[in-house]
């Protein structure tokens, strides 16, 4: 009996170690809708990004596959210097690869350079989207304050929220801005629709599989996006109330630039 126990103890220890490692691996992986840890990469000086982003003459970076199954984006600056961004979580043939190239090359979005991740499936918080849109539209600092019950004015993203609110691109809900809430697909489309000047929404939502889920306030924006080709069902799902992913935001901005151009709102 004692011999059996001596044999069983090492087996149990091995199982315990194995389970502990598995649980640790689970903790290290974030769900696509989890809060992204890239806040620090979005902290940028307002004056330094006033002219961020490209335009009709923008030259995108060169994409090359890397040994990790991801891709490298090599961006050439006006002075001829180059910088290579390595992403292990973006395959060169992914439906969002060109969009990632676009936002990285134009300086509109970034990734985690230390971990070499873009995190394409992660959701985008409202505060982060304010920073992204500020970069994309070439925003400039504004003196006008934005009064929200959940903002003190000391937040690193406050200047970008002020600009978004001042331009009428984003608002609050019940006196709060909800900076940590994830932006939905419909909400992202509404912001771009406003940036475009709320053009006449020609056409209908016929063929859009989630038309019944579109809110009354978002109908014109989604109709415009659907009929202009800003969103399609070829590459991913554009469910109105679903949290918009970083990959989807990159794609929206690339298509918007091709369709309308970047606006200095």
What are these regions (language model features)?
Residues 1-12, 21:
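N-terminal Sec-pathway targeting helices
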Residues 9, 18-97, 110-130, 134-158, ...:
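Feature responds to low-complexity, polar/acidic, surface-exposed segments characteristic
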Residues 98-106:
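Mature N-terminal segment immediately following signal peptide/propeptide cleavage
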Residues 104, 165-166, 226:
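Alpha-helix C-terminal capping/helix-coil junction sites
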Residues 222:
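Catalytic cores of secreted/periplasmic or lumenal enzymes
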